[in-house]
Amino acid sequence: VGSEMCIRDSPKDIVKKLADIGGFGGFLPTNYGGSEIDFTSYGLMMQELERGDSSIRVLSSVQSLVMNTIYSLGSDDQKQKYLPKLASGELIGSFGMSEPNHGSDPSSMKSHYSEEKDCYIVNGSKMWIGHAPICDVAVIWAKSKSNKYAGFIVERSTEGFSTAKIEKKWSFRA
């Protein structure tokens, strides 16, 4: 079992199964793909996933974190575009806060953004970002020159967006 767990690249093979049981954003409204379960039920679901394989629980938690961020802070168009696909597992999300040398301390964040004519330019590096190598979309955090923080939904196909492939990562299986 140990050698199989080490060579498995990612848990993508079980994404559909997690989606089918409401493992992604289950507390969100049904019109966005959620199942409107309460937070206690969601917590119990995470506890059971954790009992089997912590990395699978992380997949569900990170996906739900991305979904909750879009649900709480995104526009109606962004919610309609991303949430149902994240809930169904069609898209895998990643949450980009942590940075080299600073971890997840927003006050030390070096990633920055600027507003151009019709878009934002985001520059910086992130580190320790769960599921970044397999994500289709990421919520990336950065700050402006005036220290105004913002989250950006970045699709994998966006020019300049890249992630490193992590091979044979034991992570939570160690």
Where are these regions (language model features)?
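Short Gly/Pro-enriched turn/cap motifs at secondary-structure boundaries
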Residues: 86, 101-104, 128-131, 143, ...
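N-terminal glycine-rich anion-binding loops that anchor highly charged ligand groups
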Residues: 10-21
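Short, small-residue-biased leader/transition segments that mark boundaries at the very start
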Residues: 1-7
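Flexible, small-/acidic-enriched active-site or ligand-binding loops
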Residues: 108-110, 157-174
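Internal helix-loop-helix
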Residues: 20-92, 130-137
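A gly/ser-rich beta-alpha-beta helix-loop segment of oxidoreductase catalytic cores
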Residues: 92-114
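A short core secondary-structure module
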Residues: 119, 123-164
